Curated annotation (Swiss-Prot):
Keyword Iron-sulfur among UniProt keywords: no
Organism: Zea mays
Protein name: Probable phytol kinase, chloroplastic
Enzyme class: transferase
Organelle transit peptide residues: 1-49
Major localization class: plastid
Membrane topology type: Multi-pass membrane protein
Catalytic activity reported: phytol + CTP = phytyl phosphate + CDP + H(+)
Amino acid sequence: MAAAAAWTGAASPNSLLLSRSPPHAAALAPSPGSSMRRRLLLGVGTPAVAALAAAAPPAVLQDGAVTVLITAGAYSLVRVFDELTERRLIEKSLSRKVVHVLSGVLFMSSWPLFSNSTEARYFAAVVPFLNSMRLLIYGLRLYTDEALVKSVTREGKPEELLRGPLYYVLVLLFSVLVFWRESPIGIVSLSMMSGGDGFADIVGRRYGSAKLPFNRKKSWAGSISMFISGFLLSAMMMLYFSSLGYIDVIWEEALGKLALVALAATVVECVPVTEVVDDNISVPLATMLVAFLLFSSNRTIVN
């Protein structure tokens, strides 16, 4: 809790982003934000919302079921691209980066499926936690899974699972536990890591003949793609969560700040320190820092 509190700013009447979290004491009861989200999704009036709320399962059952569903979906996603790669329907490098992009985007998109209980984030955290355990087991060669290794590593070596892929799921885990769905910091950080960094590699491999003068491993096309895709995905995910009532966004202010965050993440991704610090660590950490500086002073928790 102390870690989460450190990222919250002072209350302001003109706050850029307002959390819609329910009170802890009434976490299991339908909140105004929850009712609003149901109205948005159903397109119906209050009576239907009340009926749906009355018929809703207990939070622990809802969160448990969603956790199982998302865990199965994450496993299936990797298996599908394993199969596509094995059949030579998609290049290995492209398969790896598509999984990189979709894993973060789909995981974030699933957060509204969880209840409004205070324990919901811990259920969501089970998904990246299980994936991290899986990567550790196969990365340490305690068991073997050639399909997994081929689909998410560059050179097909099991020990690679302990670097980029493991860092990736650990950032997912950290973002869920510390920020969750009411904070723009976690949303933007995961958007830049999954979408921005992912598309930078995809575009850079195909159109990256013009290299950066200070880093010959990076290209202008890849860096520009990272800025644009990271910015757009961040904005879309912010729109997604704001439309469901988790955050309020003043877009005239938010878009400029998102552009600054995307620029900072792009600069960090361009720096030639890949051999020392993996992009899956440097990009989200830089994004979190800049997003915290830009957004935290305008963010308040509404109880």
